[in-house]
């Protein structure tokens, strides 16, 4: 059983997946920092001076609150700033993954096309015709 597990782990796809998950987890921290520390302050500067986009919300029950946590404690809230952060994170991660995959595909050789089947010789065609005629009888 241990040998089977070792064989399973040593397959290329499993190792590639494990490396991808680990790198992806580490990369998420970089993207979160990029969004929270660089992009959000720039967007906040454009839309009203707030650098924390997660504090943009709309209380649905008419309550007033200064922070998202207070608004959530008071009732239902449409937290569109948090959603905007999540969308920006997703788009950046998806774009970077696209760039990585595109670059990796350039380095991976494309599999060779299988050679075309050889055309039958004239004698093989004649034998096939004879076979077909005999089959019709």
UniProtKB/Swiss-Prot annotation:
Its main location: membrane. One of its GO terms (cellular component) is plasma membrane. It comes from the Bacteria. Keywords: Cell membrane, Ion channel, Ion transport, Membrane, Transmembrane, Transmembrane helix, Transport. The keyword Hydrolase does not apply. One of its GO terms (molecular function) is mechanosensitive monoatomic ion channel activity. InterPro entries: Mechanosensitive_channel_CS (IPR019823), MS_channel (IPR001185), MSC/AndL (IPR037673), MscL_channel (IPR036019). Homopentamer. Belongs to the MscL family. This is Large-conductance mechanosensitive channel. It comes from Chloroflexus aggregans (strain MD-66 / DSM 9485). The gene is mscL.
């Amino acid at each position: 059983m241990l040998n089977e597990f070792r064989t399973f782990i040593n397959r290329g796809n499993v190792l590639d997946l494990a490396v991808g998950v680990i790198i992806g987890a580490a990369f998420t921290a970089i993207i979160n920092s990029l969004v929270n520390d660089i992009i959000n302050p720039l967007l906040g500067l454009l839309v009203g001076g707030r650098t924390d986009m997660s504090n943009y919300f709309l209380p649905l029950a008419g309550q007033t609150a200064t922070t998202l946590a207070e608004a959530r404690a008071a009732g239902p809230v449409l937290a569109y700033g948090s959603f905007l952060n999540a969308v920006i994170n997703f788009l950046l991660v998806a774009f970077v993954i696209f760039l990585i995959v595109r670059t990796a595909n350039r380095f991976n050789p494309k599999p060779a096309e299988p050679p075309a089947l050889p055309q039958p010789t004239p004698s093989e065609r004649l034998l096939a015709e004879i076979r077909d005629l005999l089959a019709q009888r």
